[in-house]
From Swiss-Prot:
It is a single-pass membrane protein. Its main location: membrane. One of its GO terms (cellular component) is membrane. It comes from the Bacteria. It is found in: Membrane. Keywords: Membrane, Transmembrane, Transmembrane helix. The chain crosses the membrane at residues 59-81. This is Uncharacterized protein RC0045.
Length: 108
């Protein structure tokens, strides 16, 4: 399957997967910008994970971070996320204990 011309979508709130290869991109006013037929070869999450690049033959579709949540949850194992959250909460707890002084005055 051939892809259309490379399309850059800047202001997208969500994408609806109508079938295996058809994606409809909507902007914030809920009107479809364009229906693009793509053949997903590789999903590459870049740097700070603020956008996603779908490689479709030689064409690239850039989509904003809001759509990443669905894909990230399927890529990253949930136990890894749970471990990361519990580690972060433990650091917060230790920091809050360190702030309390013996005479009930906070040292932070």
């Amino acid at each position: 399957m051939n892809c259309p011309l490379s399309l850059q979508i800047v202001n997208v709130s969500y994408i609806v997967n109508t079938n295996s290869c058809s994606w409809i991109a909507f902007n914030n006013s809920k009107y479809p910008i364009k229906t693009i037929k793509i053949n997903i070869i590789n999903i590459n999450i870049l740097g700070k994970i603020n956008h996603m690049v779908i490689f479709c033959d030689n064409n690239i579709v850039i989509i904003l971070w809001k759509i990443m949540v669905v894909i990230i949850s399927s890529i990253i194992h949930r136990t890894y996320i749970r471990r990361w959250i519990s580690r972060r909460n433990n650091i917060r707890r230790k920091a809050s204990h360190a702030c309390k002084q013996p005479n009930n005055t906070t040292g932070c």
